UniProtKB/Swiss-Prot annotation:
One of its GO terms (cellular component) is chloroplast envelope. This is UPF0548 protein At2g17695. Pfam families: DUF1990. It comes from Arabidopsis thaliana. Belongs to the UPF0548 family. InterPro entries: DUF1990.
Amino acid sequence: MVFLSWGRPSSEQQQQVINKTGTFNYDNKYRGVSSRSIAKLKEDSEIDKDGFLINHARVLVGSGRESYEKGKKALQNWKHFGMDWAFVDPATPVETGKKFCICVKEVLPWVMLPLQVVYVDESRKSRKGPAHFGYGSGTLQGHLLAGEEKFSIELDGNGEVWYEITSFSKPAHFLSFLGYPYVKLRQKHFARHSSEAVLKHVNAS
């Protein structure tokens, strides 16, 4: 089951997809695992043994509390999907259990990929100290891949603001099996464009 649209998917089309999807399409033991650090993910032999590939990107997008708050707001409003070839409905609330679609333009049709927010994580040690906001989403039945992806923004101890994407995934449909090298290239392409979108938002006046 693949969800396609010849035009830019409407909110109604996305809701129809969400209504048709069932549960997560990957093992329950991996639920929330994307919340771990990239080092711990790479140390987990089970992830590799079960065929998942890890993707990671971390980009400096600014400095100071104001930049961090802008970055946090960008993630809450899905600005990291602010591209002409990929988007999430910006009205989608970032809350645990919320189902949504990532809509991606592929050559001719758009593909609607269903996911569900698995967790939302926020921490702040003090009003002026380090802070972190992020959330992870898991793939649902009907997604071309199986796994999780985390987006996060961090204000570190040096006052620098970092945008980070961490995911582990594997093909969940014969189309993604056949075109997995292309899928991996698209993931890297997305990471670059997403980082540029967050950087643009953080540095906007």
